[in-house]
Amino acid sequence: MILSFDEAGDLLDQMAEEFPEEFYRDLNGGISLLPQAVEDPAGEELYIMGEYCNDMMGRYINLYYGSFAALAEQENWTEEDWEDELYTTLSHEFTHHVEGLAGERGLEIRDQLALEQYKQEQ
């Protein structure tokens, strides 16, 4: 099942309201659902589902609808799968944000190690 961009956005809005207000501290760019699919720049058959950004524009979270839709099509997702994947990704990116505020990089390091392990197994 492929949710429309608007349906996915509505789900994401509902989920975002469930997170504590403290998580939004200094997240001046908020959370955006962008239409594109983003593939791994290294050319692997991997999609980037979301990213936490801290740059000249500020701190913000981008989630990529097209990446979710591509996997949903490949894996024949249900609405529950959409909910799980959106929530997991949003939680993951919030963790990057909160760690960043604390000057930590633990999740960033774990992400890199997991990606390296995945590439070795392929």
Where do the PLM segments sit?
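A conserved beta-strand element that flanks and buttresses the S-adenosyl-L-methionine
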Residues: 90
